[in-house]
């Protein structure tokens, strides 16, 4: 379990198997019910050889695909991380919308130029809670080949990613980002809206 201090991340370096998703939870269990914040979207792209890797970045450079924040080498494939400028709340009504949004993004990213897996049934659609091997841990290739991350872009917004969807009906628009206001600032700015607990 990783808490806000993130100190557990250093402790898993070199571990044989440790996964994490870009989701913040309340409570000790990693369940949809306990999910509070989505910090980004991680897309698993398999069947990537040098030709496909070049094409992934070519498509990003020419705005056919969204520019990822981090590209992670996971052994036989890539994990493309699109970290958000601000976390998105994981209200229950948004979870299904965000899953469909991610599926549509995967459909765009996983194409005949970015993967050797060219059949639609070979595409792997993972939900928003899917965890992947952590950077610094062992890849499927063993301890001599740790999972490695490369910073490839800036943090993104949901609105930016919406612009790359092939089906506009999958765009996520009805939500508010996490506020930068502290509780004290919110009470001062919105005294009638912020409830006080004693």
Per-region residue spans from a language model:
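Short, compositionally biased segments
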Residues: 193-194
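Conserved small/polar residues in nucleotide/adenosyl-binding loops
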Residues: 197-198
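Catalytic "initiation/cleavage/transfer" segments centered on a nucleophilic residue
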Residues: 113-190
């Amino acid at each position: 379990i990783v808490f806000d201090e993130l100190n557990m991340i250093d402790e898993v370096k070199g571990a044989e198997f440790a996964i994490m998703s870009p989701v913040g939870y309340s409570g000790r269990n990693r369940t949809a019910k306990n999910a509070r914040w989505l910090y980004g979207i991680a897309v698993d792209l398999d069947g990537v050889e040098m030709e496909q890797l070049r094409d992934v970045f070519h498509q990003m450079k020419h705005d056919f695909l969204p520019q990822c924040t981090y590209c992670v080498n996971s052994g036989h494939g890539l994990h493309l991380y699109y970290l958000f400028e601000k976390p998105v709340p994981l209200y229950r009504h948004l979870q299904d919308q965000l899953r469909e949004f991610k599926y549509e993004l995967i459909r765009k990213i996983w194409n005949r130029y970015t993967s050797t897996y060219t059949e639609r049934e070979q595409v792997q659609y993972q939900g928003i809670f899917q965890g992947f091997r952590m950077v610094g841990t062992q890849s499927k290739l063993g301890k001599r080949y740790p999972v490695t991350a490369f910073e490839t872009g800036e943090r993104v917004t949901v609105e930016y990613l919406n612009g790359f969807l092939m089906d506009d009906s999958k765009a996520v628009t009805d939500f508010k980002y996490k506020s930068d206001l502290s509780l004290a600032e919110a009470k001062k700015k919105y005294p009638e809206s912020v409830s006080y607990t004693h």
